[in-house]
Amino acid sequence: MPITELLEANAKKYPNEVSLVEINPDIQEKRRVTWRDYELIESSPMCHYRREITWHVFDEKANRFAQLLISRGIGKGDKVAILLMNCLEWLPIYFGILKTGALAVPLNFRYAPDEIEYCLNLAEVDVLVFGPEFIGRVEEIADKISQNRLLFYVGGDCPSFAEDYDKLTANCASLAPGIPISDEDDAAIYFSSGTTGFPKAILHNHESLMHACKVEQKHHGQTHDDVFLCIPPLYHTGAKMHWFGSLLTGSKAVLLKGVSPKTILETVSNEKCTIVWLLVPWAQDILAALDRGDIKLEDYKLDQWRLMHIGAQPVPPSLIKHWKEYFPHHQYDTNYGLSESIGPGCVHLGVENIHKVGAIGVPGYGWE
């Protein structure tokens, strides 16, 4: 069963329920910054504070982009790269690509122009979808990368060297393209950007993506009533594959574009989040703010928050001990994986093993 069928099933079963929410904290950058200055999560001052879509609209947007790609000759075996900050359009674009039988190629938003060009050529990308944060970088290489390659722009004020995604998809049919897709078909190319040099391409099929959905749900017990708070970038297998648990259960997820302790707790409270994935520095910042009295737990509604998990880096046992002093009822898990192993969960601590915090964990579901 290809992963696109999960989206279509959710659109039929929960058409009017919220699937995705984007929270964009109202942080205005007063000084001029270059693309190199962007933090891990960058707010978009020109966007609305909060946007949401239902499962029906999610699927409809994916279908419209799929129809646009098909109308331009994109189909099975072709590659479509995504160069976007986290936003409400990111996942519908990803699934629109998959619905055509093409391969999605997420790109790290920290790539310099030469790295973008390198990845596009290495993966033999046919289409690049990019957002406003990347106009300068893409323009620098536009003459070279636009030869025999489509450039679609997501956002206002489309640059002259690209085509307007919003205007084009608005005129496309919202019907599913109906392209037959099997579990063995190639689905995505991810780039592993380690310390050994330029990015390396990793190929995954639809069976791998479906396995990632099952791993996440098995490890963290997502139900339809859960609400997942996602802060890290979606181009990374970690963030997207943790969200796959929400996809499998048809539950709501929140994309937060800010990492301050106040912003995180406000979002958990306002959106009724039950599962939050943090990185060590963000958890440390929350605890430090609580210790100083900068924020107070009684100012937020956090009773529904049941699970906090961390991955991607070593977790000091003292951090989780301190965390449990403020959140004694929280479940906790540590997740590790590789882009090659389709994201987190290759090994994990397990929510029942909090007394073993500091250990790398045990083989995850399906990895025994």
Which residues does each PLM region occupy?
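Conserved structural elements of the adenylate-forming
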Residues: 59-65, 183, 188, 202-223, ...
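Conserved AMP-binding/adenylation subdomain of ANL enzymes
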Residues: 210-227, 235-275, 289-290, 296
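Gly/Ser/Thr-rich phosphate-binding loop
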Residues: 248, 273-278, 287-355, 368
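Structural core segment of the AMP-binding/adenylate-forming
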Residues: 5-7, 71-72, 99-167
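ANL superfamily adenylate-forming
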Residues: 24-51, 135-183, 289-293
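Conserved AMP-binding/adenylate-forming core of the ANL superfamily
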Residues: 16-87, 91-95, 112-117, 166, ...
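Conserved pre-ATP/AMP-binding loop-to-beta segment of ANL
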Residues: 16-18, 170-191, 198, 221-227
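Conserved adenylation A10 loop of the ANL superfamily
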Residues: 47, 189-201, 213, 353
